[in-house]
Regions:
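Conserved beta-strand-loop-beta-strand element in the redox core of flavoprotein oxidoreductases
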Residues: 168-187
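Ser/Thr-rich, low-complexity intrinsically disordered segments
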Residues: 3-29
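Flavin (FAD/FMN)-binding glycine-rich loop and adjacent Rossmann-like elements that form
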Residues: 37-41, 45-50, 94, 161, ...
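Ligand-binding pocket scaffold of soluble enzyme catalytic domains
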Residues: 57, 67, 96, 186
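Conserved N-terminal/central alpha/beta ligand/cofactor-binding core
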Residues: 36-41, 56, 74, 80-81, ...
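Extreme N-terminal leader/targeting segments of oxidoreductases
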Residues: 17-19, 27, 31-59
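N-terminal Rossmann-like FAD-binding beta1-loop-alpha1 element of flavoenzymes
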Residues: 59-80
C-alpha cells in the first residue's frame, strides 16, 4: 500500500517580517487555478501599525479543541500560566462546534480521557449505544459546561472570539502571536506556543513546512456537517430503513450512510450524520459552499423522514445544524519525526512514545467520483513519538491534534479525539522544566506523563 504513494511537500509559508515583492499575484503564488481579473491589483501592502502587547504567558495554546484543552489543563496543573485563544465562544472544538457528540478511541486511555468520560457519566450526560458500544455519546451543552468548570478549577485563562492573525518569529523561535478580535489587533507574548488549531495555522504562519492531502493530487478527506433533530416518538432506531427511504427517493446521502446518535437525557433527540462535503478546509470559498450544501442536504433528509418514515417520525423536525463544519483533514506540519504507514503496519513502538493508538485508519474518500463512504485499514497498535509534536523549523513551537507530523494514511488513524487529548497532555509537560520541547529528557518526560495519567485529579466538581 505504501509503495503506491509519493509524498509531496507543500511550499513554505511566508514568515512574519519576510520582505516580498509588491505587487504579488497572491492567488498564483498559492497555486490557485482560479482566473484573475487583470483590472484588480494583484496585492496590497498592509499599512504598518503599532500593536499593543495585551498579555504575557508561559504557555500559549492556540485552539481550544480536545488537544488544546488537554494541553492547557495539563500545563496549568503543572504550575504554568496558561492562556487559550479560541475563535468560538466555547471550548471543545469538534466536540462542540463540530457537534461530534461521541468520544472516539478513549476507552483504553487514562488521564484526561478517563477524567472527562467519568465526569460526563457522573452527571448523566454520557450514554452508550449499540453502534459503538465502547464510545460514549455525550450531550453538547453538558460538554460545554464541563469544560467551563475545568477552566475554573485549573486557573486556565481563556479568550474567546479570537483568531491568530500572524506570528512574530525571530530566527528559530516565536516570541508571540498577533491576534484579531473585537478588541482589534493585539500581541500575546509567550515562552512556549502549542498549535492546537487543527489546521496547523500557527505553524504555517511561522513558515513551517507542511503537507496537505494525499500524495499526487493533494485532495483531503471530506468535511461533515451534523444536524440535530427532535420529535421522534418511537423506540430504538434502525438506520437501514432510513437509508433505504433516502435512496428510493433519489436522495442518496453524500456520506453514503445515515448514522444517528441519541442525545443523553433528551428523548427523541438525535445527532444526524449523513453528509460528505468536499473541498479544501483552508479555502474560505470551499468552506462557505460546504456549509450551505450541508444544511440543504440535512433539511431534505429530515423532511423526507417526516413524510415517509412512519408514524414515529411524523413530528420530526430539525432543531439546528452544527455551529461549524467538522473538518477531518488539512495541514500536517513537519516535525522532528514523520510517522509513516509503514511504521503503523509494523505496530511500531518508540522510546519517546507518548500515546498508544488502537484506532483504524479511517479514510473517507477525498473525491466523490470514487464513491461515497470510506475505507478502513486495520493496523496493530502503535505509538506516536513525542518528536512528531515538535515543529521541525521552530524550536519553541509544538503541535497537538491532527496537525502533527505524519503521512496521509497514518494521519487517518491518529486524527481522532482520544489521541488528540493524549497529544495535548504530552505537549504540555515540557513547560514544567522551562526549556524548549526538544531539550526535554525523554525518560523523565515519559515517567511524568505516566504518573499524571494514573493520578486522580481532585476538584470540588469531581
Amino acid at each position: 500500500m505504501a509503495g503506491a504513494y509519493r509524498e509531496e511537500t507543500r511550499p513554505k509559508a511566508i514568515a512574519q517580517g519576510t520582505k516580498i515583492p509588491i505587487p504579488v499575484a497572491e492567488n498564483q503564488a498559492m497555486g490557485d487555478s482560479r482566473s484573475m481579473n487583470p483590472t484588480i491589483p494583484q496585492g496590497m501592502l498592509e499599512p504598518a501599525r503599532h500593536v499593543p502587547v495585551a498579555r504575557e504567558t508561559d504557555v500559549l495554546v492556540c485552539g481550544g479543541g480536545p488537544a488544546g484543552i488537554a494541553a492547557a489543563f495539563t500545563a496549568a496543573r503543572a504550575g504554568a500560566r496558561v492562556l487559550i485563544l479560541e475563535r468560538h465562544p466555547f471550548l471543545g472544538g469538534v466536540w462542540t462546534a463540530g457537534a461530534l457528540t461521541i468520544l472516539i478511541d478513549t476507552e483504553h486511555k487514562d488521564g484526561l480521557n478517563r477524567e472527562i468520560r467519568r465526569r460526563l457519566e457522573k452527571r448523566g450526560a454520557a450514554t452508550y449505544c449499540g453502534l459503538w458500544p465502547d464510545w460514549p455519546v455525550y450531550g453538547l451543552e453538558a460538554m460545554k459546561a464541563l469544560l467551563d468548570e475545568m477552566v475554573e478549577e485549573t486557573g486556565v485563562e481563556v479568550q474567546y472570539y479570537t483568531t491568530v492573525a500572524a506570528v512574530a518569529r525571530e530566527g528559530r523561535r516565536i516570541s508571540g502571536v498577533f491576534t484579531e478580535s473585537k478588541s482589534g489587533r493585539e500581541f500575546v507574548r509567550a515562552k512556549v506556543i502549542i498549535d492546537a488549531t487543527g489546521d496547523g495555522d500557527v505553524a504555517a504562519q511561522a513558515g513551517c513546512e507542511f503537507k496537505l492531502g494525499r500524495p499526487g493530487d493533494g485532495k483531503t478527506q471530506p468535511m461533515t456537517l451534523y444536524g440535530r433533530i427532535g420529535g421522534y416518538t418511537g423506540g430504538p432506531v434502525h438506520v437501514q430503513p432510513l437509508l433505504d427511504i433516502a435512496i428510493n427517493a433519489g436522495v442518496q446521502p453524500s456520506y453514503g450512510d445515515v448514522t444517528l446518535f441519541p442525545q443523553p437525557g433528551q428523548p427523541g433527540v438525535f445527532l444526524l450524520m449523513a453528509t460528505h462535503l468536499y473541498g479544501n478546509a483552508l479555502d474560505v470559498r470551499d468552506l462557505t459552499r460546504a456549509e450551505m450544501q450541508g444544511r440543504a442536504e440535512i433539511r431534505k433528509l429530515v423532511d423526507l423522514y417526516r413524510r415517509h418514515a412512519g408514524p414515529d417520525w411524523k413530528n420530526v423536525y430539525l432543531i439546528d445544524t452544527g455551529p461549524f463544519l467538522g473538518v477531518r483533514e488539512s495541514r500536517r506540519i513537519l516535525g522532528r519525526h514523520y510517522l509513516t504507514v509503514e511504521e503503523l503496519k509494523a505496530g511500531k513502538t518508540f522510546e519517546d512514545g507518548i500515546c498508544h493508538v488502537r484506532f483504524i485508519a479511517d479514510i473517507h474518500h477525498p473525491d466523490p467520483s470514487e464513491g461515497s463512504g470510506l475505507t478502513h485499514v486495520f493496523f496493530p497498535a502503535y505509538d506516536i513519538p513525542y518528536r512528531c509534536l515538535i515543529a521541525r523549523d521552530v524550536d519553541n513551537l509544538m503541535m497537538a491534534g491532527r496537525c502533527i507530523s505524519g503521512d496521509h494514511i497514518a494521519f487517518a488513524s491518529y486524527r481522532v479525539t482520544g489521541d488528540a487529548i493524549a497529544m495535548g497532555e504530552a505537549a504540555a509537560l515540557c513547560v514544567k522544566h522551562g526549556i524548549d520541547p526538544d531539550d526535554v529528557h525523554r525518560p523523565e518526560l515519559l515517567a511524568e506523563l505516566a504518573k499524571m495519567r494514573t493520578t486522580e485529579w481532585t476538584s470540588p466538581a469531581c
